[in-house]
Amino acid sequence: MTLQQLDYIIALDKTRHFVRAAELCGITQPTLSAMIQKLEDELDCKIFDRSRQPIEPTEIGRKIIRQAQVIHYHTNQLHETVQSEKNTLSGTLNLAIIPTIAPYLLPSFIASFRKLYPNIVLKVSELHTTTIIDKLRVAEIDMAILSTPLEDPKILEVPLYYEKFMAYISPNEAIYDRLELSASDMPLDDLWVLEEGHCLRNQVFNFCSEKTHQSSTYEAGSIDTLIKIVDINGGYTIIPELHIELLNEKQKLNLRNIVNPEATREISVVIRHDFVREGVLNAVANCVKKIIPSQMLDPRLKKFAIKL
């Protein structure tokens, strides 16, 4: 068994296609097939079910691939430990970010990070929280930026900033004339929310925890869609503070502060406990903090944070 063979089964699991996996690994398809077959013979089990199209891992194959991913991660960590001792920031960084942060953070972050750390190859994926946690556990990604706390003992959270929620209300709503709103002012019957899988959806419902959860006519896939729905259909939605910069001047008139209590979410960079690239972690954290308004870095806002 070699590290190369483990890389091959990881690639095949990712692509579910022998030719594409071979291209990903930079070898010929017959070589890839032969090396995977050799590994299966050595382990005396089938890692992939070749009768299916596209091919799929067998039940034991999934377990082997998960272990291969962890071994691959720790091998990279070994190289990174050496680089850390040399005080050089290089290599590849696989970073994930949730969709309700990405639109306003990513454009500036990517530009700034590439300029400051040209020797790091940055790969960014936009994923939901549950997918991020799964990928972090098996070391498919190195770190992520998302809403916390996760309360997962295997994941280390490093808080970056605290973001308030705002109510975005149609001018046709009875509550539109109020300058501030509390949870009791906002009827769930008129609330538009994100679809299942978004942590922001859970936070909105937790904020309105004293009310009965309703079945929305439509659950949107993005905050932009929610805003357009409110503009045309009425009702209201809840949006993160940083999304305000993406609104036009007319839309900004529809915003209201939420009080008693304030609604805030904690945004953190999260890593596995065995992550050794401290320099890269600090690079990401510092880069984000340079983008975020200074008042959102105040840790005293944590007391208003809503649980997921």
Where are the model-predicted features located?
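Flexible hinge/capping segments at coil-to-helix
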Residues: D152-L191
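Secondary-structure junction motif
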Residues: Y176-D177, D189-K211, R277-N286, I291-A305
